């Protein structure tokens, strides 16, 4: 938020990833919004929006300068990283949902997910990575400055040594897979594929 708004946390309203909200008497995240519904996630799940963001971002200023012609879309595996940099009035914001393995959004942006997003979630769901192996890119001896594999502080409930099998420790795709997948390099590939789909379907850069 600070980087894309040019304002300090004291000015842009986003003082952390989460904090205690005195008005509601509970902990909130920077983007949680009880008035908004999640699209593409679990039924009844709380939605996300930039309603706590004060001021404008580069994306908002692009929309203003172009008379609304510019297209701004936020995409990230983290909700806050998709929502806050893209500002108050983007054409959409999408992030990964580890409960369903889908790219999701909220009713702040749409009444329903665009058809191309639904198609991506159906045809190119991260469950397709089930059983893939995450191996080192280079021979083990190359990584002389890296810490030992299976370090004492590692707390993964899955594999702790290369190669890693992306299966969440289960026999079929499910929430544990999605959580493990999110921390693997395959997630970066998946995110890039989604971004390419957004460029093609939203006519970005045209």
Model-derived segments and their meaning:
Residues 1-6:
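N-terminal cofactor/phosphate-binding cores enriched in small/glycine residues
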Residues 7-8, 13-205:
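His/Asp/Glu-rich, glycine-adjacent segments
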């Amino acid at each position: 938020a600070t980087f894309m708004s040019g304002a300090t946390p004291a000015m842009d309203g986003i003082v952390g990833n989460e904090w205690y909200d005195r008005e509601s008497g509970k902990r909130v995240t920077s983007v949680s919004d009880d008035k908004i519904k999640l699209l593409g996630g679990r039924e009844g799940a709380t939605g996300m929006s930039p309603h706590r963001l004060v001021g404008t971002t580069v994306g908002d200023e692009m929309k203003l300068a172009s008379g609304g012609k510019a297209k701004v879309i936020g995409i990230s595996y983290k909700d806050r990283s998709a929502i806050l940099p893209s500002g108050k009035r983007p054409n959409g914001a999408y992030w990964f949902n580890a409960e369903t393995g889908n790219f999701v959004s909220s009713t702040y942006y749409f009444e329903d997910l665009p058809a191309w997003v639904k198609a991506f979630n159906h045809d190119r769901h991260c469950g397709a990575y089930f059983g893939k192996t995450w191996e080192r890119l280079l021979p083990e001896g190359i990584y002389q400055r890296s810490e030992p594999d299976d370090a004492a502080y590692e707390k993964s409930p899955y594999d702790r040594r290369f190669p890693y099998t992306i299966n969440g420790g289960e026999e079929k795709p499910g929430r544990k897979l999605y959580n493990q997948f999110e921390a693997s390099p395959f997630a970066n590939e998946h995110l890039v594929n989604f971004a390419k789909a957004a460029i093609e379907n939203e006519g970005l850069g045209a």
